Amino acid sequence: MRVALCALALTSCPAAAAPFNSCGSGVCFSGNINHNAILQRAPERSAVYGSVNTASPAGAQVVVTLAGTAADGSAYSKDFPAAVNADSTYKALLDAMPAWGNFTITATCSACAGSPLSVSVVGVTFGDVYLSSGQSNMELALYNTFERNISLANVRSGKYANIRVLHGGYQGLPPNQDGNWILQPGPNVTNCSQTGLADGMWCSGLELAQHDDNSDGRSAFFNVRAVPWYFAEKLTDLFLSDGGVPPPPIGLVFNPVGGTMVEQWTPFEDQLSCASIACMCTSSGCNGSQPLNPNNQSACSRNGELWRGQQQPFVNMTLKGFLWYQQVQLDRRSPHPGA
């Protein structure tokens, strides 16, 4: 089952205000920057960001080093200093890099508190990165589609080796938390064939195809989200059909949550200007008839919860575009189903 989608091209987002610190060690990367990550290629400058121990002194500086082999085989190494902000976060913009290459990224903060004072991720390359969000239609796994076995056979034969996926997990945040502008660091594991599709790990299709899910014995590749994977397959095929142009690496970041409403994904403040948006139900009761206003954010805590928990960590990530798929939950309340 194929689904046709279009992706909206983006440039890198500006640094966000008041990020949330989630690194208790000396220095760390945000969890979306892990081993085997795909970062956005030129002409954009890809962002590398994270946080340091909150006890670090004022004026501390993180040096982000990108070193490795470029696509043309030449050696590359360059430092990118990044000031530590008052909230203990940092962000560096790398040079615009062409597709492919094999790099190590290191963040070092010799003046920071705690340990380690230097962390590295390996196997990083550059390509086109897409954020895939939405409701259960986007959450649907390959296992539930008709062409899953065709995709599995293609991956095992070495096709679509340019595609890597990152599973972002789930985190909804109440309004009394500003939200995560970075993610918890991912597992220090470099090959998904031993783990399957785990939160915070960049995985190739072949690695997942080599791992059986212990819960039911099927290939872990079938746990990949179907819509973005088929999108990346089709995009790869289009590159190859265009005079045999080698496809770039394609990075797919998954963070959909089934059974959700668009109000959960939208910043609370942005919903205040729309009179038709009401307060969503909470665990303590339903305030559905209550209009939103700046003073009832606690009572209407579900409005915006997924923006704070699911989307904010990727605001600073440089992207090629995004995929959004949501319908069923909205249909249940719409006078025009499917609209």
Predicted regions and their residues:
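Cleavable N-terminal signal peptides of Sec/SRP-targeted secreted and luminal proteins
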Residues: 1-16
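Cell-envelope and extracellular/periplasmic
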Residues: 18-339
